[in-house]
Amino acid sequence: MLRSMLTASTTLNQLQQQIDTISSNLSNSNTTGYKAKDTNFSELVRQQFDQVDEKNEEVAKARKTPPGLRLGVGAMMSSRLVSDQGSIQKTDRDLDIAFTSPYQYLQVNVNGNRQYTRDGALYVTPSAANANQLQLVTGNGYPVLDENGNTVNIDSSMKNITINKNGTLTASDGNAVQRFNLGVVQVNNPQELKSEGNNLFSIDNAAAFEELNGANRQNIGMQQGSLEMSNVDISEQMTDLITSQRSYQLNSRTITMGDQMLGLINSVR
C-alpha cells in the first residue's frame, strides 16, 4: 500500500505541473506572439525484484514474460517550447510588426539584461535622456534594441515611420530621415530559450542563437502593420486538460484506497 501511495504521490506532483502548463497556454491564447508549451510524460526508473528460480533454464524457457518483477515508481513530466508560426493578423498600425519566420526574435533591454520576444506590438514613449526624442519600447515598456545593442531613440519631430521586411526602421518628417536596424536574432535551438515571463525569453548558451547583422539581415522576415497571434491550439489544450484531470483523480483515488487499506490493517486486533 505504501508503495502505491508513494508512486501516486510522485505522479500527482507531475500532473499538477502539466495542468499549470496547460492553464498558462489557455490564458495566453490571445497574447501576441505567445509560444505554447507541449508536455509529455516518461516513466521513472523501475525497480526490479529477481526471482530465485530465474536462472533455471527450464523455467526460463517456459516463461512467456521476462524473469523478475518490475515495479514502477511514478512518471516524470517534461515540456518543450512549440515554435510553430502563429497566424498573422493585419492591424494597419505603423508600429505593429510580425515575424514571418518562426525562429526569429526581437532584442529588448530588461533592467540592463538583453532578452528576446516575438511580441511585435511596439510603442514610443518620451525618452528620459532627451526631451526631444521618443524611445521605441514594447507593450510592457522595455526598450527595443538596435543591431548594436543600443536603444532606438527617434526625434520627436518625426511623423512617418516605416519598417521594412529586413527589420530596418525609417523615420522621417518630410525633410530629415533617421534609420535604425532593429536587433534581431535567429534561434538555432528553441529549447535553449528560458521563459522569463511577460512573453520574454533569455538564452544562456551563446551558441544557440545568431545575431542577424550585416548581410545576414536579408534573412529577416518581418511584416509591418501586422501582429503574430498565439500558436496555442485551444481544442488540443482542452483535450489535454481533461485527460490530465482524469489522471489526477485516478492517482488521488489510489492514495485514498491505500489509506483505507492501512486503516483496516490498524483495526485488526
From Swiss-Prot:
One of its GO terms (cellular component) is bacterial-type flagellum. Pfam families: Flg_bb_rod, Flg_bbr_C, LlgE_F_G_D1. PROSITE patterns: FLAGELLA_BB_ROD. InterPro entries: Flag_bb_rod_N, Flagellar_basal_body_rod_CS, Flagellar_FlgE/F/G, Flg_bb/hook_C_dom, FlgE/F/G-like, LlgE_F_G-like_D1. One of its GO terms (biological process) is bacterial-type flagellum-dependent swarming motility. Residues 7-65 form a coiled coil. Transmembrane segments: none annotated. Keywords: Bacterial flagellum biogenesis, Coiled coil. PANTHER family: FLAGELLAR BASAL-BODY ROD PROTEIN FLGG, FLAGELLAR PROTEIN. Belongs to the flagella basal body rod proteins family. This is Flagellar hook-basal body complex protein FlhP. It comes from Bacillus subtilis (strain 168). The lineage of its organism: Bacteria, Bacillati, Bacillota, Bacilli, Bacillales. The gene is flhP.
